[in-house]
């Protein structure tokens, strides 16, 4: 199993660039509480956000974050641009217990996971609607 450990937020990403890896259908507060991660409040050009930093495996830096004004209680995951791939997403899911529902994932992290929380292959009902 891949490990996930709390760490301090780094000021720089190893590649000098980060990307959103995924949007998890898990409330930020629940996730950081369950993982016992310290939370830091920051402000960027989109507003205030709560951030919790962690180390995935031996060296990959991961930020879990949520914009305070966002009414949707999901958790965004940011990683170094050099770690934006399917193995990072797979390791993250493994570290979180394997069954974390992913609302959206960066296309560069592999094929999107279209399974809904109930395990169906069409969570939005688009096939039945003819979309």
Question: Where do the PLM segments sit?
Answer:
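A cross-family detector of function-defining hotspots
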Residues: 1-71, 82-126, 130-131
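Beta-strand/loop substructures that line and gate deep hydrophobic ligand-binding cavities in soluble
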Residues: 73-78
């Amino acid at each position: 199993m891949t490990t996930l450990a709390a760490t301090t937020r780094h000021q720089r990403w190893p590649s000098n660039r980060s990307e959103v890896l995924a949007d998890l259908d898990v409330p930020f507060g629940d996730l950081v509480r369950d993982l016992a991660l310290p939370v830091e409040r920051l402000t960027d050009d989109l507003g205030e956000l709560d951030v919790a930093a962690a180390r995935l495996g031996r060296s990959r830096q991961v930020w879990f974050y949520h914009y305070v004004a966002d009414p949707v209680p999901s958790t965004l995951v940011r990683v170094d641009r050099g770690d934006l791939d399917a193995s990072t997403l797979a390791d993250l899911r493994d570290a979180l217990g394997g069954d974390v529902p992913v609302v959206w994932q960066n296309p560069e992290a592999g094929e999107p996971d279209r399974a809904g929380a109930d395990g169906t292959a069409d969570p939005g009902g688009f096939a039945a609607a003819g979309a």
